[in-house]
Amino acid sequence: MAIKRFAITVFSIVFSLGAIAADTTPSESAPSWQADAQKEIKANNYDAAIKTLLAANQPNSADWNNLLGYAQRKKTPPDLAAAERYYQAALKIDPKHRGALEYYGELFLMKNDLAGAEQMLTRLDKICLFSCEEYRDLKEAIAKYKTKNKKL
């Protein structure tokens, strides 16, 4: 009977931790600049997203820096140096910012720095208790990078 109670307790703890880790939905009180920038990014309007974010001028926000880094990295042509500065700023504000860790890892791959990308993956692994989307996405990007570069 004690084993059954122990198993139920462990299951309950594991289940509740998984629910916490999976809850990455943006809050309803997200600032308008964030929603506007995300809308522009979704539409691949990276220059418009950059303008929206710069007008909002929220340099103490990890999300603001992360979105600016993302838009700088994805625009044509990408500004990798600017993207890196924004990702570094986001991680200085919030060292566990999962989006910044994932995207900074992808930036490292763009710069052919596999070791840097793997460092970001290791950091994500430590903060994502039972995996998370950002960890899985970066892990997949690293695997694709390795496969692509084996052929060269």
Across the structure, where does each feature detected by a protein language model lie?
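Residue-level recognition of tetratricopeptide repeat
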Residues: 38, 70-72, 106
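Canonical tetratricopeptide repeat
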Residues: 67-68, 103, 137-141
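Structural signature of tandem alpha-helical TPR/SEL1-like repeats
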Residues: 43-48, 76-89, 112-120
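Structural marker of alpha-solenoid helical repeat scaffolds
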Residues: 56-59, 93, 126-130
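TPR alpha-solenoid repeat register
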Residues: 64-66, 100, 134
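Register position in tetratricopeptide repeats
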Residues: 42-43, 74-76, 110, 127, ...
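Terminal, low-structured helical/coil segments at or just beyond the last alpha-helical repeat
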Residues: 23-31, 118-152
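Alpha-helical segment of the N-proximal tetratricopeptide repeat
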Residues: 28-56
